[in-house]
Each structure stands twice: as structure tokens, then as C-alpha cells.
Amino acid sequence: MRHYETMFILKPTLVEEEIKSKIEFYKEVITKHHGVIETSLDMGMRNLAYEIKKHKRGYYYVAYFKAEPSMILELERLYRINEDVLRFIVIKYESKKEVEAWHALVDRANKKPSHAKEKHEKTEHAHSHHAEEAKSTESHSE
């Protein structure tokens, strides 16, 4: 399975129930094709950077998931045929560095410290511990 991020913008004219049903529909598409949604961000109604199909606002939704590459074509096809989707993007994370960034984004969305941050904190702790030991040996030798 590969790592992906998708974001779509829905028309602002939809009512809350319609928005929820569209979001659930796309989540089901991912899970029905054996994908695993790690986390998602419901960003809500926001101003668009520029007007799209005569709309100045849109409802943003982001999902981070793992899936087989064959499923992405179907997801994109379903985005295209839905008139309520103003824009969409699917981003694939391939390299080791990109996958680490994907994990950091998922952790941030879940409000957890990222893997990279944990590694950094561990090395800082080890460095400070060694510095304290060095100071204590210096004071004992005097």
C-alpha cells in the first residue's frame, strides 16, 4: 500500500447533511477499495484564493490514507463526475523522506508529536544527559 493525501472542496451552497454525506461517500470509496484512512481534517467553510465556478467560498476536507495505486483512478473519476466538487487533488508520497513527511502530517492532524520531533527530543535529552555527566566529573576532579 502507498501513502496518499487527498483534499477536495465542496460547493458552499450545500447544507450540512449534504456535506456530511459527500464526505462519508468518499471515505467509503477509499475503505471499500481496501484503503485505510489514517486521519482526516474537516477544515470547514473557507474563502477561496480565487473564484471557482462563480463561488468565492468552499467547504474543505482533507484525508490522509494508505491504498493501492489502482484505487486512485476510481477516486479521481468519482470526484470529476460530482458537480458538487469544485476542486480536488490527490498527492502520492513515494520516497522515504516524503513518507516521513506524511507521517508527520498525520501526527500533527492527530495532535501527536511527530516521529521526527521525537527523534530530535531523544537526541537532545541524550546530549543534555552527557553534558551533565561531564560537568559532574569536572567538579569531582577539582
UniProtKB/Swiss-Prot annotation:
Keywords: Ribonucleoprotein, Ribosomal protein, RNA-binding, rRNA-binding. GO terms for biological process: translation. It holds the Pfam family Ribosomal_S6. Residues 110-142 are annotated as: Disordered. InterPro entries: Ribosomal_bS6, Ribosomal_bS6_CS, Ribosomal_bS6_sf, Ribosomal_S6_plastid/chlpt, Transl_elong_EF1B/ribsomal_bS6. One of its GO terms (cellular component) is cytosolic small ribosomal subunit. GO terms for molecular function: small ribosomal subunit rRNA binding; structural constituent of ribosome. Belongs to the bacterial ribosomal protein bS6 family. Binds together with bS18 to 16S ribosomal RNA. This is Small ribosomal subunit protein bS6. It comes from Helicobacter pylori (strain G27). The gene is rpsF.
